[in-house]
Amino acid sequence: MKRTLTRVLSLFLAVLCAAAVLSPAASAAAYYENDLPVVYVIGRGTWIYDKNENKIYPTDGIEKAIKNNVNNLATAWIKSLISPNSDWDELSDAIYKLVEEEYKNYVLDDNGEISNGTHIKPNAEPKAKKSNFSITDYQFSYDGRIDPRENAKLLNEYINKVLTVTGKRKVQLIGRCLGSTIISAYLTMYGCSKVDTAIFYAASNQGIVPLSAFFTGDVIFDCKAIEKYGDDYLNNSASDGSDNLSRSLVTLGYKLSKSFYLTDYVIENVEKAYRDIARTLYPRIVLAVYGTCPGFWTMVRDDYYEKAKQVVFEGKAKYAKLIEKIDWYHYNVFQKFPQTLKKCKQQGMKVAVIAKYNIQLAPLFKDCMKQADNLVELETASYGATCSDIGQLLPDSYINAQEKAGKGKYISPDLKVDASTCLFPDYTWFIKDLPHDVFPNSVNELIMKIFHSKEPFTIDSDEQFSQYLQYESNSLLLSKVTELDLADENDSAEISLRKLLNLFNTLFWLLKNLFNIM
């Protein structure tokens, strides 16, 4: 009897073991060699509410406000045109009143503090989870306006909560755009002892030209840059009738002005008008929007910073406390960030950088032809890449010298970027043709590959994720950048013919819609 019972138990255990071995892999939890919670510090902060819980930011009201004030703006414009003093004061005042009204509940006080009860919704309590962490489990939201020291403190508290509920000793950190400035402040203030890996994705923590130039008033109108920007706009715009009427009017006007060589004339007069308007509009327009928000000063580039303070604050003592906040970040975090990151890496924190390129900045700044993702320049987002200008290639002499120095592998196949000059060349990825505000899942796959690797994940770790990747907008997938991208479409007769046909197509579609609404 005892022997029979033993055999039955043995058979039962054997069946259980077989079931465990033969059960489908899909039913088993995925295993990752480095499975840690991911804290995602998003870009731009989050929605902001007034004391009555009405959402005030992000605002969609500027476009609406302009439409609602077309008559006022048009009247002010006409008065400025016929002004005996040939100034634009009427239009400047009208623009300021419109913007000030739209942002009056958003801006902070002269000390860079919230004094009107505006706020964000607090982050949800982190959920208890022990494994299979994803990029969306722990998203840290923040008020992008306030002192980055306050946000770093809140991030530290959030990380501690995540570690408590997960039972882990470290987190993975990723900062996107403005979120990278929060991580920068966090690493400066609290160190990296709780961070396994930090990824900087389309990072703005070394400044961005558009915001910097807005703060200093250094707006320029470069004809060549505007024509290049216009050509890209037309190539990426629909020409099958999906465009709206106003876009087609702009498109047609641009094409005709370029065809008749009027672009220089138009730009010259627009620039003159801007200079006259800016004379009375600065600095009050900056103060009405972002000027009193320490969080936005974190993205003012080093070569613009001192001038920006002079332009915006004009030496006025009432801004002393605000200036203390922004100076702390700029001198202790911004300027020292490369050293901070190197120190963290030496202490064992893994680092990765993902930057984007081949999309021009708005053609209103002196550096607008630099490689960028339409908002952040590649040189700063990658922490030091050497780049050609948009539409250009790195010089042959430069490439030859780099190859002789044994650094040829860091040159992009399209000959536009050299990663060897980056802070971390082996841990920096470049994605071509991916706009700044587009974040496809295909990039998340790369991010999670980096996070799941026990050893530092490099540009050579996985052939699928080589250093230079191309974003395919149709499939939303990534592919390798190849030498085929070297072709310059500007010299193609086929492209020239297509542009000519697009001109007639736009004209035809515009006429058709005009008749439809008449």
Per-region residue spans from a language model:
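N-terminal non-catalytic accessory region
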Residues: 29-174, 180-232, 360, 367, ...
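Bacterial N-terminal signal peptides
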Residues: 11-20
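Charged, terminal alpha-helix-loop-beta segments
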Residues: 373-374
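Bacterial N-terminal signal peptides that target proteins for export
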Residues: 1-11
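Hydrophobic membrane-targeting and insertion signals
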Residues: 6-7, 25-28, 199
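Alpha/beta-hydrolase-fold enzymes
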Residues: 224-317
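Sec-dependent signal peptide cleavage junction
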Residues: 19-33, 511, 518
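Alpha/beta-hydrolase fold catalytic core
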Residues: 138, 146, 277-370, 392
